[in-house]
Design a protein with these regions (language model features):
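Cys/His-rich microdomains that often coordinate metals
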Residues: 408, 438, 442
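Conserved alpha-helical segments that form or flank metal/cofactor-binding pockets of metalloenzymes
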Residues: 29-80, 141-164, 243-246
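Extended, helix-rich structural scaffolds rather than catalytic motifs
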Residues: 1-52, 256-390
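Intrinsically disordered, low-complexity terminal tails and linkers in eukaryotic proteins, enriched
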Residues: 362-429, 447-506
Length: 506
């Protein structure tokens, strides 16, 4: 009887080639230009798509195995979290505001990224790039789903979680992340890779999924920690894909350098403006804090970002144009953003508050050059108004930046006492901006940004026609429950009552 000889096991490299490159084919019924119409749209020149390599060499069979294992662990933990009243294990109900912002602003962005990468998997001719983009598309949709599932337990007990999808499309502070992703999705395929692979995955994700998720652990929120670290292993692959695409473009043709540099300048600034939300969550909305926004920026921005640009310098890439202005703004942006959220808290689907004296002592230690000089006096003034029974509320409408769509609340890079406002006239109309970076982005692509959907202008159009009550109904905001000051809110009262029941026999 002949002995069966065991087949030699394929090496990882052979298996990767078999399940990616060998699945591709050359077009015959239509030309490549007809099948991939956008690949030349932006002026990027690619001579050999086979030069692109996936450092992880991940194939679909391995992908399903890894993700299924993570799913089993994830749902086991969040089921245990729900069954054991995990919502009562958090440090303080104020922490819920950070989760509400995350659900309204960040989770829909994950879904938008999923749609974008599905499109990139169709628009890139390279088989390796197609497979990597398709896997990332599934990743991003999974991230959105797991975040929504993890936070759905809080929706059973607390206000403000119920209408995150409406908030994403209609709420004024959610247009900041929405405009970021709409901008990326309406770009060509190569710019999209810079926008998401570099700006969102490298700049934003590092500063969100590491320090903020550690903050969730410090504050007893096992559900958020679980989805954060379940996603983090994917994010490492996503960052690598984005950086690999940057290097691939730069290596293919010298003419690609100025185009890529322009995109890095643009998307660094767009990502930095979006980070204002993350900094505010870290400095003000975590009752038990891990690190300040400044400390996180020093690690993940200055050190990691600096190392990245030193690595890219051999291709001719310099640090982004707005890098110095970003560094000057780090010690101010979270305070300025929180002050804005507090004065407009009648129009937010989460609660805000004046920091306690202990918290201001912490902020003073973390921001020794700025907090006591510029921001403690403002909080002290707001505290006096509240104690007198006349809490400050800004009932006017904020002027929005035409590019990033954030209210123009940030100050000049070299003068923290003066608001930074820029203006450009285009085709007989004036447009306003929060910074030089946003103005430069607009002036480079004015026809794109004059079409921006701005929520403050929308308030005076149909179907709202300037009616604040109609606006609240339109955005699914329940006044007196979802919005306003944390002190005296239903969330504060309910959390205290339920915690009391859980820890006493009374």
């Amino acid at each position: 009887m002949d002995m069966q000889v065991a087949k030699k096991k394929l090496s990882l490299k052979e298996k990767y080639k078999l399940l990616t490159r060998d699945l591709g084919w050359d077009t015959t019924y239509h030309t490549k230009d007809e099948v991939f119409p956008y690949v030349q749209y932006e002026g990027i020149k690619i001579h050999d798509w086979d030069k692109w390599e996936d450092p992880f060499r991940l194939t679909m069979d391995s992908y399903w195995k890894y993700q299924a294992e993570k799913e089993r662990k994830f749902y086991a933990i969040i089921d245990a979290h729900a069954q054991n009243n995990g919502h009562l294990h958090i440090t303080d109900a104020r922490y819920l505001s950070a989760l509400k912002i995350f659900l309204q602003a960040i989770s829909p962005g994950e879904y938008a990224a999923g749609k974008g990468f599905a499109r990139m998997g169709r628009e890139f001719p390279g088989v390796g790039t197609q497979v990597a983009c398709q896997m990332q598309s599934i990743d991003e949709i999974r991230h959105a789903q797991t975040q929504i599932h993890a936070l759905s337990n809080y929706n059973k007990f607390y206000n403000g979680f119920h209408a995150f999808a409406d908030a994403r499309d209609r709420m004024w502070y959610c247009t900041l992340p929405r405009s970021f992703f709409d901008d990326a999705l309406s770009s060509g395929p190569f710019e999209f890779m810079i926008a998401i692979g570099f700006s969102f995955e490298y700049v934003l994700t590092n500063l969100l999924f590491v320090p903020f998720m550690s903050g969730a652990a410090y504050n007893g929120d096992m559900a958020t920690v679980t989805f954060g670290f379940s996603a983090q292993s994917d994010e490492a692959r996503h960052m690598t894909l984005g950086l690999e695409c940057i290097k691939f473009m730069l290596e293919q043709d010298p003419a690609n350098l100025p185009i890529v540099q322009g995109w890095i300048d643009k998307w660094f600034w767009r990502g930095f403006r979006l980070l204002g939300v993350v900094g505010t969550m870290m400095d003000y909305m975590l009752p038990k804090r891990v690190m300040s926004w400044r400390e996180a920026w020093n690690i993940y921005g200055v050190e990691n970002g600096g190392a990245l640009f030193r690595d890219l310098a051999r291709y001719g890439i310099r640090p982004p144009k707005g890098w110095d202005d970003a560094e000057k703004g780090i010690d101010h942006m979270s305070h300025q953003f929180m002050l804005a959220l507090y004065q407009y808290n009648f129009g937010t689907a989460f609660h805000s508050w004046i920091p306690s004296e202990d918290e201001m002592v912490w902020l003073s230690k973390k921001y020794p050059d700025t907090f006591d000089k510029y921001y403690r006096p403002r909080w002290a003034h707001l505290s006096k108004l509240k104690a007198a029974g006349t809490p400050f509320a800004n009932m006017g409408l904020a002027k929005l930046c035409q590019t990033c769509q954030i209210p123009t609340v940030f100050t000049e890079p070299d003068d923290p006492t003066s608001l930074c406002q820029r203006e450009t006239e285009y085709k007989g109309e004036k447009y306003h901006f929060c910074s030089d970076g946003c103005q430069h982005i607009f002036e480079n692509e004015p026809e794109k940004y004059i079409q921006a959907w701005l929520p403050m202008q929308q308030l005076f159009q149909a179907p709202i026609n300037g009616d604040l009550g109609a606006w609240m109904n339109w955005v699914s905001l329940i006044p007196g429950k979802d919005n306003g000051d944390f002190d005296g809110s239903e969330d504060e009262r309910n959390f205290a009552a339920w915690r009391q029941q859980a820890t006493s026999n009374q």
